Protein backbone atom coordinates (compact mmCIF):
# COMPACT_ATOMS: atom_id res chain seq x y z
CA UNK A 1 0.00 0.00 0.00
CA UNK A 2 0.88 3.60 -0.29
CA UNK A 3 3.30 4.81 2.42
CA UNK A 4 3.45 1.47 4.20
CA UNK A 5 7.11 0.70 3.51
CA UNK A 6 9.53 0.78 6.44
CA UNK A 7 13.27 0.78 6.03
CA UNK A 8 14.36 -1.81 8.62
CA UNK A 9 18.02 -0.93 8.02
CA UNK A 10 17.56 2.31 9.98
CA UNK A 11 17.07 2.70 13.74
CA UNK A 12 13.84 4.66 13.13
CA UNK A 13 12.45 1.80 11.00
CA UNK A 14 13.32 -0.81 13.62
CA UNK A 15 11.65 1.23 16.37
CA UNK A 16 8.53 1.80 14.25
CA UNK A 17 8.25 -1.92 13.50
CA UNK A 18 8.77 -2.84 17.18
CA UNK A 19 6.02 -0.42 18.26
CA UNK A 20 3.63 -1.90 15.67
CA UNK A 21 4.37 -5.48 16.77
CA UNK A 22 3.87 -4.58 20.45
CA UNK A 23 0.56 -2.86 19.63
CA UNK A 24 -0.77 -5.85 17.67
CA UNK A 25 0.26 -8.36 20.34
CA UNK A 26 -1.29 -6.17 23.06
CA UNK A 27 -4.61 -6.06 21.21
CA UNK A 28 -4.59 -9.83 20.86
CA UNK A 29 -3.98 -10.25 24.60
CA UNK A 30 -6.38 -7.57 25.89
CA UNK A 31 -9.39 -8.67 23.79
CA UNK A 32 -9.96 -12.02 25.52
CA UNK A 33 -9.41 -10.48 28.97
CA UNK A 34 -12.13 -7.88 28.33
CA UNK A 35 -14.41 -10.64 27.03
CA UNK A 36 -14.01 -12.60 30.27
CA UNK A 37 -14.60 -9.46 32.36
CA UNK A 38 -17.75 -8.65 30.40
CA UNK A 39 -19.28 -12.08 31.02
CA UNK A 40 -18.33 -12.43 34.70
CA UNK A 41 -21.38 -11.50 36.80
CA UNK A 42 -21.32 -8.85 39.51
CA UNK A 43 -22.63 -10.11 42.84
CA UNK A 44 -23.66 -8.82 46.24
CA UNK A 45 -23.10 -10.46 49.60
CA UNK A 46 -23.92 -9.59 53.17
CA UNK A 47 -21.07 -10.27 55.59
CA UNK A 48 -22.38 -10.63 59.14
CA UNK A 49 -19.23 -11.38 61.11
CA UNK A 50 -17.61 -9.53 62.84
CA UNK A 51 -19.68 -6.54 61.60
CA UNK A 52 -22.56 -6.39 59.15
CA UNK A 53 -21.35 -5.19 55.74
CA UNK A 54 -22.65 -5.06 52.19
CA UNK A 55 -19.93 -6.36 49.88
CA UNK A 56 -19.88 -6.02 46.10
CA UNK A 57 -17.84 -8.44 44.01
CA UNK A 58 -16.95 -8.94 40.38
CA UNK A 59 -15.86 -12.53 40.00
CA UNK A 60 -13.69 -13.24 43.05
CA UNK A 61 -12.51 -9.63 43.41
CA UNK A 62 -14.13 -7.52 46.10
CA UNK A 63 -14.89 -4.05 44.72
CA UNK A 64 -16.78 -2.21 47.48
CA UNK A 65 -17.44 -2.82 51.19
CA UNK A 66 -20.05 -0.72 52.97
CA UNK A 67 -20.79 -1.20 56.69
CA UNK A 68 -24.56 -1.33 57.26
CA UNK A 69 -24.20 1.41 59.90
CA UNK A 70 -22.90 3.78 57.18
CA UNK A 71 -25.96 3.32 54.92
CA UNK A 72 -28.47 6.18 55.10
CA UNK A 73 -30.88 5.16 52.32
CA UNK A 74 -31.63 2.10 50.18
CA UNK A 75 -33.82 1.96 47.07
CA UNK A 76 -34.47 -0.60 44.34
CA UNK A 77 -34.97 0.70 40.80
CA UNK A 78 -36.21 -1.19 37.76
CA UNK A 79 -34.18 0.96 35.37
CA UNK A 80 -30.77 2.57 35.50
CA UNK A 81 -30.59 6.35 34.94
CA UNK A 82 -28.29 7.59 32.18
CA UNK A 83 -24.69 7.56 33.30
CA UNK A 84 -21.44 8.89 31.89
CA UNK A 85 -18.16 7.24 32.84
CA UNK A 86 -15.50 9.27 34.65
CA UNK A 87 -13.13 6.34 35.10
CA UNK A 88 -13.54 2.58 35.23
CA UNK A 89 -15.07 0.03 32.87
CA UNK A 90 -18.25 0.32 30.85
CA UNK A 91 -18.56 -2.96 29.00
CA UNK A 92 -21.81 -4.32 27.58
CA UNK A 93 -22.63 -6.43 30.68
CA UNK A 94 -20.44 -4.86 33.38
CA UNK A 95 -19.96 -1.30 34.60
CA UNK A 96 -17.56 -0.55 37.44
CA UNK A 97 -15.97 2.65 38.63
CA UNK A 98 -16.99 6.29 39.00
CA UNK A 99 -19.79 7.61 36.80
CA UNK A 100 -21.89 10.78 36.63
CA UNK A 101 -25.70 10.55 36.81
CA UNK A 102 -28.12 13.41 36.21
CA UNK A 103 -29.77 13.58 39.66
CA UNK A 104 -27.07 11.95 41.79
CA UNK A 105 -23.89 13.54 40.47
CA UNK A 106 -20.81 11.34 40.91
CA UNK A 107 -21.71 7.76 41.83
CA UNK A 108 -19.84 4.47 42.17
CA UNK A 109 -21.10 1.51 40.15
CA UNK A 110 -20.51 -2.23 40.22
CA UNK A 111 -23.34 -3.69 38.18
CA UNK A 112 -24.73 -5.31 35.06
CA UNK A 113 -26.47 -2.50 33.12
CA UNK A 114 -28.73 -5.06 31.39
CA UNK A 115 -30.22 -6.29 34.71
CA UNK A 116 -33.85 -5.70 35.62
CA UNK A 117 -33.31 -4.47 39.20
CA UNK A 118 -30.71 -2.06 40.57
CA UNK A 119 -29.83 -1.39 44.19
CA UNK A 120 -29.08 2.25 45.04
CA UNK A 121 -27.24 2.66 48.34
CA UNK A 122 -26.62 6.08 49.81
CA UNK A 123 -23.97 6.75 52.46
CA UNK A 124 -22.29 9.88 53.80
CA UNK A 125 -19.33 8.98 51.56
CA UNK A 126 -21.36 8.83 48.35
CA UNK A 127 -23.93 6.97 46.30
CA UNK A 128 -23.40 3.40 45.10
CA UNK A 129 -25.36 1.37 42.54
CA UNK A 130 -25.18 -2.44 42.52
CA UNK A 131 -26.77 -5.54 41.04
CA UNK A 132 -26.79 -9.06 42.40
CA UNK A 133 -26.45 -12.22 40.32
CA UNK A 134 -30.24 -12.14 39.81
CA UNK A 135 -32.99 -9.54 40.19
CA UNK A 136 -34.46 -11.58 43.04
CA UNK A 137 -31.16 -11.54 44.94
CA UNK A 138 -30.88 -7.76 44.46
CA UNK A 139 -34.38 -7.29 45.91
CA UNK A 140 -33.78 -9.70 48.82
CA UNK A 141 -30.59 -7.92 49.84
CA UNK A 142 -32.40 -4.55 49.68
CA UNK A 143 -35.22 -5.91 51.88
CA UNK A 144 -32.71 -7.29 54.38
CA UNK A 145 -30.80 -3.99 54.58
CA UNK A 146 -34.05 -2.04 55.03
CA UNK A 147 -35.09 -4.38 57.87
CA UNK A 148 -31.64 -4.11 59.45
CA UNK A 149 -31.79 -0.31 59.28
CA UNK A 150 -35.36 -0.17 60.62
CA UNK A 151 -36.33 1.82 57.53
CA UNK A 152 -39.74 1.42 55.89
CA UNK A 153 -39.83 0.46 52.21
CA UNK A 154 -41.14 3.09 49.78
Describe each model-derived feature in a short phrase:
Residues 8-43:
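Alpha-helical transmembrane spans
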Residues 11, 69-73, 132-138:
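A short, sequence-level motif marking secondary-structure junctions
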Residues 152-154:
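Short, solvent-exposed mixed-charge patches
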Residues 43-61:
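Short extracytoplasmic/periplasmic juxtamembrane "stem" segments immediately C-terminal to an N-terminal membrane anchor
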Residues 52-56, 73, 130:
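Short hydrophobic/aromatic-rich beta-strand segments that constitute the beta-sheet cores
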Residues 1-8:
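Membrane-proximal soluble regions of multi-pass membrane proteins
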Residues 57-67, 72-125:
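Non-transmembrane, membrane-adjacent beta-strand/coil modules in membrane-associated proteins
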Residues 106-150:
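A membrane-cytosol interface segment of integral membrane proteins
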